[in-house]
């Protein structure tokens, strides 16, 4: 973790009158919360897909054996929707969320045109961004796990819903 990040955390704690008891990297903290100790003996990858980055932690033999990050995440998908549908970023994010539970969505583009779009049509348009996200995560998992696929991959985080 970069020194400036640690110093910022310590400064915030000090201003709040608190002391640091421990500092854990986010992917390791996620594993500790989401994967029971009995499952950590298995070779499992936990991928936390956030807005800007996807954090990856891998377990085997009861412990975290590797962790890493790729700079591709949910915002890439939102940007692709924005580009293809001519939506500003907040409306593209809203459309992305609506696609999770609806087969069609109604959007108004930046020119004021209202269009009803089918989920499959949108997914086809943004498939290059989806492929980049999945390929980046897959490549990093293999790199972290000595070029072998883990027994399971668990997806968490807001970006995992897309």
Task: Show the residue positions of the predicted features.
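Gly/Thr-rich phosphate-binding beta-strand-loop-beta motif of the actin/hexokinase/Hsp70
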Residues: 37-67, 81
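A general structural motif
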Residues: 129-138
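Small/polar loops that bind or transfer phosphate-bearing groups
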Residues: 1, 22, 48, 69, ...
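Metal-dependent phosphodiester-processing active-site neighborhood
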Residues: 60-95
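Glycine-rich beta-strand-to-loop/alpha-helix junction loops that act as flexible
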Residues: 151-160
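Residue-level signature of catalytic and energy-coupling elements of molecular machines
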Residues: 13, 48, 81, 137, ...
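Nucleotide/phosphate-binding catalytic cleft detector across ATP-hydrolyzing
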Residues: 1-44, 63-65, 74, 89, ...
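Gly/Ser/Thr-rich loops at beta-strand to alpha-helix junctions
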Residues: 3, 51-53, 159-162
């Amino acid at each position: 973790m970069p020194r400036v990040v640690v110093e910022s955390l310590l400064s915030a704690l000090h201003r709040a009158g608190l002391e640091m008891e421990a500092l854990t990297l986010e992917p390791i903290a996620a594993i500790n919360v989401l994967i029971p100790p009995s499952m950590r003996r298995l070779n499992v990858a936990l991928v936390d897909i956030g807005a800007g980055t996807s954090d990856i932690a891998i377990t085997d033999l009861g412990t975290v054996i590797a962790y890493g990050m790729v700079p591709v995440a949910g915002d890439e998908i939102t940007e692709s929707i924005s580009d293809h549908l001519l939506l500003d970023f907040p409306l593209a994010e809203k459309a992305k969320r609506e696609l999770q539970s609806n087969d069609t969505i109604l959007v108004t583009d930046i020119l004021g045109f209202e269009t009803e779009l089918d989920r499959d049509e949108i997914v086809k348009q943004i498939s290059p961004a989806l492929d980049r996200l999945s390929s980046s995560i897959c490549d990093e998992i293999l790199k972290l796990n000595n070029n072998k696929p883990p027994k399971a991959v668990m997806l968490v985080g807001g970006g995992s819903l897309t």
